[in-house]
Protein backbone atom coordinates (compact mmCIF):
# COMPACT_ATOMS: atom_id res chain seq x y z
CA UNK A 1 0.00 0.00 0.00
CA UNK A 2 1.45 3.37 -1.02
CA UNK A 3 1.85 6.26 1.37
CA UNK A 4 0.96 9.58 -0.23
CA UNK A 5 2.48 13.01 0.25
CA UNK A 6 5.91 11.79 1.38
CA UNK A 7 8.72 14.14 0.42
CA UNK A 8 12.45 13.54 0.77
CA UNK A 9 15.78 15.29 0.36
CA UNK A 10 19.44 14.96 1.13
CA UNK A 11 21.28 17.63 3.10
CA UNK A 12 24.80 18.66 4.04
CA UNK A 13 25.47 21.10 6.88
CA UNK A 14 28.68 23.15 6.83
CA UNK A 15 30.33 24.96 9.74
CA UNK A 16 31.26 23.81 13.22
CA UNK A 17 28.93 20.81 13.28
CA UNK A 18 31.16 17.91 14.35
CA UNK A 19 32.05 17.33 17.99
CA UNK A 20 29.15 19.53 19.17
CA UNK A 21 26.35 16.91 19.43
CA UNK A 22 24.79 18.13 16.18
CA UNK A 23 23.74 14.63 15.06
CA UNK A 24 22.14 13.81 18.41
CA UNK A 25 20.12 17.03 18.35
CA UNK A 26 19.15 16.40 14.70
CA UNK A 27 17.97 12.92 15.69
CA UNK A 28 15.77 14.35 18.46
CA UNK A 29 14.32 17.04 16.20
CA UNK A 30 13.59 14.59 13.37
CA UNK A 31 11.90 12.14 15.74
CA UNK A 32 9.84 14.94 17.31
CA UNK A 33 8.64 15.90 13.82
CA UNK A 34 7.95 12.29 12.81
CA UNK A 35 10.58 12.35 10.07
CA UNK A 36 12.58 9.36 8.91
CA UNK A 37 16.05 8.97 7.44
CA UNK A 38 19.58 9.34 8.77
CA UNK A 39 22.52 11.66 9.43
CA UNK A 40 26.25 11.14 9.78
CA UNK A 41 29.56 12.95 10.09
CA UNK A 42 31.39 13.17 6.79
CA UNK A 43 35.12 13.01 6.22
CA UNK A 44 34.86 16.64 4.99
CA UNK A 45 33.95 17.92 8.46
CA UNK A 46 30.27 18.35 7.60
CA UNK A 47 27.12 16.53 8.67
CA UNK A 48 25.28 14.80 5.82
CA UNK A 49 21.88 13.22 5.89
CA UNK A 50 18.62 12.23 4.31
CA UNK A 51 15.14 13.10 5.56
CA UNK A 52 11.69 12.02 4.45
CA UNK A 53 8.24 12.92 5.68
CA UNK A 54 5.29 15.23 5.17
CA UNK A 55 6.05 18.60 3.53
CA UNK A 56 5.17 20.78 6.55
CA UNK A 57 7.46 18.82 8.89
CA UNK A 58 10.19 18.73 6.25
CA UNK A 59 10.07 22.53 6.07
CA UNK A 60 10.42 22.80 9.86
CA UNK A 61 13.43 20.46 9.83
CA UNK A 62 15.08 22.33 6.95
CA UNK A 63 14.72 25.60 8.85
CA UNK A 64 16.14 23.93 12.00
CA UNK A 65 19.14 22.68 9.98
CA UNK A 66 19.69 26.17 8.52
CA UNK A 67 19.31 28.22 11.69
CA UNK A 68 19.35 26.20 14.92
CA UNK A 69 21.36 22.98 15.12
CA UNK A 70 22.86 22.01 18.45
CA UNK A 71 23.61 24.65 21.11
CA UNK A 72 27.38 24.55 20.46
CA UNK A 73 27.20 24.35 16.67
CA UNK A 74 27.89 27.21 14.29
CA UNK A 75 26.13 26.70 10.96
CA UNK A 76 27.68 28.40 7.94
CA UNK A 77 25.35 26.99 5.29
CA UNK A 78 23.19 24.02 4.37
CA UNK A 79 22.84 22.48 0.94
CA UNK A 80 19.71 20.51 0.05
CA UNK A 81 19.66 18.17 -2.93
CA UNK A 82 17.65 15.35 -4.52
CA UNK A 83 14.37 16.86 -3.33
CA UNK A 84 11.44 14.76 -4.54
CA UNK A 85 8.03 13.36 -3.80
CA UNK A 86 7.95 9.65 -3.02
CA UNK A 87 5.33 6.90 -3.19
CA UNK A 88 6.27 5.52 0.22
CA UNK A 89 8.72 5.82 3.09
CA UNK A 90 12.14 4.27 2.58
CA UNK A 91 13.09 4.18 6.27
CA UNK A 92 11.27 3.00 9.38
CA UNK A 93 12.76 5.73 11.60
CA UNK A 94 15.52 8.34 11.85
CA UNK A 95 18.96 7.17 12.95
CA UNK A 96 22.61 8.22 13.16
CA UNK A 97 24.98 6.37 10.85
CA UNK A 98 28.53 5.62 12.07
CA UNK A 99 31.33 7.98 11.07
CA UNK A 100 33.07 6.94 7.84
CA UNK A 101 36.44 6.93 9.63
CA UNK A 102 35.31 4.79 12.59
CA UNK A 103 36.45 1.17 12.88
CA UNK A 104 39.75 1.81 11.10
CA UNK A 105 42.85 0.34 12.69
CA UNK A 106 44.80 2.92 14.66
CA UNK A 107 48.08 1.91 13.00
CA UNK A 108 46.78 1.11 9.54
CA UNK A 109 49.43 -0.30 7.24
CA UNK A 110 51.82 -1.33 10.02
CA UNK A 111 52.77 -4.94 10.63
CA UNK A 112 53.10 -7.93 8.35
CA UNK A 113 49.45 -8.99 8.63
CA UNK A 114 48.11 -5.80 7.05
CA UNK A 115 46.52 -6.19 3.64
CA UNK A 116 46.52 -2.43 3.04
CA UNK A 117 49.17 -1.10 0.68
CA UNK A 118 49.72 2.54 -0.19
CA UNK A 119 50.08 3.22 -3.90
CA UNK A 120 51.94 6.53 -3.57
Curated annotation (Swiss-Prot):
- The record's principal subcellular location, in a coarse class, is cytoplasm
Gene symbol?
Answer: Acyp
* Keywords assigned: Acetylation, Cytoplasm, Hydrolase
Listed EC numbers: 3.6.1.7
Sites of N-acetylalanine modification: 2
> What does the entry say about activity and pH?
Optimum pH is 5.3-6.3.
- GO MF term list: acylphosphatase activity
For this protein, the record's InterPro entries field holds: Acylphosphatase (IPR020456), Acylphosphatase-like_dom (IPR001792), Acylphosphatase-like_dom_sf (IPR036046), Acylphosphatase_CS (IPR017968)
Protein name (database record): Acylphosphatase-1
**Cellular compartments per GO CC:** cytoplasm
Record's subcellular location: Cytoplasm
Give positions of region: Disordered: 91-120
- Residue stretches of biased makeup (Basic and acidic residues): 96-107
Similarity comment? Belongs to the acylphosphatase family.
Per its record, the protein catalyses: an acyl phosphate + H2O = a carboxylate + phosphate + H(+)
Q: Sorted alphabetically, which Pfam families does this protein's record hold?
A: Acylphosphatase (PF00708)
Q: Which residues form a coiled coil?
A: none
Give the annotated active site.
23, 41
Q: In this protein, which residues make up the domain named Acylphosphatase-like?
A: 8-98
The organism encoding this protein is Drosophila melanogaster (Fruit fly)
Family matches, as PANTHER family? ACYLPHOSPHATASE, ACYLPHOSPHATASE-RELATED
Amino acid sequence: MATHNVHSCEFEVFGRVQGVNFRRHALRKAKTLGLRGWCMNSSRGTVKGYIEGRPAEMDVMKEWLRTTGSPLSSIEKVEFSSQRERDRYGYANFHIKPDPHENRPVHEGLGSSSSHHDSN
